[in-house]
Amino acid sequence: MDIRIGNGYDVHALAEGLPLWLGGVQVESPIGCIAHSDGDVAIHALCDAILGALALGDIGKHFPDTSAEFKGIDSKILLSRVIELVRSMGWSVGNVDITIAMQRPKLAPYIVPMRECMAKVMGIDVSQVSVKATTTEKLGFVGRGEGCEVYAVALLVK
């Protein structure tokens, strides 16, 4: 059995009055991510981790923010396309682990729905998808509520 590990990271600035999408789930919040797509920073980091595991570049290479095709796109579609590419190469997702850093809102009520949503898009069991949320104890741009960042790791198997 061959295995590959990929690491992903994404960050977005936050602004009032925008929808907040994380892990394919709309989170009730007065703030959301400024982005070309729907701004789902969790799925973007996950896509980068999966692509990175196979040395296929990053999300910007496959879905450039300069393309009108991806303006406002649902990030679940991007994840679905990444999974199609991975499967076409004979690989499958073993598991993923995602850490979301945001000062607010509290994300605990959304963790299970995020896991379920991303598992469904990837065609894997929810037990293979870990999502954790943390704050930065009010430190840095995340702590000041100016942005959110996500770290993701993906294990691929063949």
Describe the role of every protein-language-model region.
Residues 1-3, 157-158:
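N-terminal charge/polar-biased segments
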Residues 2-112, 122:
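RNase III-family endoribonuclease catalytic core
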Residues 107, 139-140:
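Acidic pyrophosphate-coordinating catalytic loop
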Residues 115:
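Generic structural marker for isolated residues within well-ordered, non-membrane alpha-helices
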